[in-house]
């Protein structure tokens, strides 16, 4: 059995791509997208007709509405190829505006509904800022499920659990990148691999906290740099994986053992944590890595959204 099939026995495998033509080869349950992945897809010749058709169909509408209709179009194409859910992201430029995020999330859901999609199959993806988490709380109360992304810290995870969001996406690779850069020449790749990887350790800590306290929010590890990070999190609720790494897993016959188990978390000695807004902001600020990576991620997604807008305007 290859590692991809073995992983599917203990974890829900999710494809992290806007290039939906790659989905058939790996048969993921769910899929995730973000502005960067959609931009990458529409830059390919295969997707030029989809972009052009979407722009022509909705020409004359506000630019932000055309953008939402375009990403929903990608989501609908993805949903036609998978049995599960797709995550569609709210504009990252709204990451510090709770009610604007709520409004945009509701519009995205309405657009899916207008296309005949069962909206239980859609997760609204939101950056895990304080404002984003509060927006997710409101959306969940209104029956709209959410995926909180750009999550780099247990502080964010605790707040998301308290907000009863459907799913969180703690990042692995970007945490790894930060610690590797900080260490410079002192970084020992072999010593920091697998279970010792700081990104893997972060997801494991969050997973154990949730399972220990019976928090129902799903944990989906994200942002991987190598398959060692993925196999070290086998057993996590979900893992969202880029097609290149899915291909590597499918090509590997190495044994794969379950690394995370909810039952083992019950025996840990953990203390519950709660954050109000000032406490959240202070605790997140105290984590230099999480603060830097959250800000960097929002800037990158916002920049790619702006590039995608320029492609829409030029179409």
From Swiss-Prot:
Its EC number is 2.2.1.2. Signal peptide: none annotated. Pathway: Carbohydrate degradation; pentose phosphate pathway; D-glyceraldehyde 3-phosphate and beta-D-fructose 6-phosphate from D-ribose 5-phosphate and D-xylulose 5-phosphate (non-oxidative stage): step 2/3. InterPro entries: Aldolase_TIM, TAL/FSA, Transaldolase_1, Transaldolase_AS. GO terms for molecular function: transaldolase activity. Keywords: Cytoplasm, Pentose shunt, Schiff base, Transferase. The active site is at residue 125. CDD domains: Transaldolase_TalAB. It is found in: Cytoplasm. GO terms for biological process: carbohydrate metabolic process; pentose-phosphate shunt. It catalyses: D-sedoheptulose 7-phosphate + D-glyceraldehyde 3-phosphate = D-erythrose 4-phosphate + beta-D-fructose 6-phosphate. Transmembrane segments: none annotated. It holds the Pfam family TAL_FSA. Its main location: cytoplasm. Homodimer. Belongs to the transaldolase family. Type 1 subfamily. This is Transaldolase. The lineage of its organism: Bacteria, Pseudomonadati, Pseudomonadota, Betaproteobacteria, Burkholderiales.
């Amino acid at each position: 059995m290859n590692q991809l099939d073995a992983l599917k026995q203990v974890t829900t495998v999710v494809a992290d791509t806007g290039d939906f033509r790659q989905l058939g080869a790996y048969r993921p349950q769910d899929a995730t997208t973000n502005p960067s992945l959609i931009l990458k897809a529409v830059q390919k010749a295969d997707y030029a007709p989809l972009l052009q058709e979407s722009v022509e169909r909705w020409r004359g509408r506000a630019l932000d509405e055309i953008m939402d209709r375009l990403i929903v179009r990608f989501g609908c194409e993805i949903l036609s190829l998978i049995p599960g859910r797709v995550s569609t992201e709210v504009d990252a430029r709204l990451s510090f505006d709770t009610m604007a995020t709520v409004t945009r999330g509701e519009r995205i859901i309405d657009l899916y509904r207008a296309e005949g999609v069962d909206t239980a199959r859609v997760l609204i993806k939101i950056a895990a800022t304080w404002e984003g988490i509060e927006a997710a709380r409101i959306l969940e109360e209104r029956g709209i499920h959410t995926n909180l992304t750009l999550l780099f810290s247990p502080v964010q995870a605790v707040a998301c659990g308290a907000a009863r969001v459907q799913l969180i996406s703690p990042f692995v690779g970007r945490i790894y990148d930060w610690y590797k850069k900080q260490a410079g020449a002192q970084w020992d790749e072999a010593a920091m691999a697998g279970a010792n990887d700081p990104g893997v350790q972060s997801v494991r800590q969050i997973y154990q906290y949730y399972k220990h306290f019976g928090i129902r929010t799903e944990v989906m590890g994200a942002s991987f740099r190598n398959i060692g990070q993925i196999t070290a999190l086998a057993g996590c609720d979900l893992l969202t994986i880029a097609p290149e790494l899915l291909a590597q897993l499918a090509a590997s016959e190495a044994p794969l053992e379950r690394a995370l188990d909810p039952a083992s978390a019950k025996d840990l000695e953990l203390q519950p944590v709660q954050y109000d807004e000032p406490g959240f902001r202070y605790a997140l600020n105290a984590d230099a890595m999480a603060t830097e990576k959250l800000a960097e991620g929002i800037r990158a997604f916002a920049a790619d959204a702006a590039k995608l807008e320029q492609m829409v305007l030029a179409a």
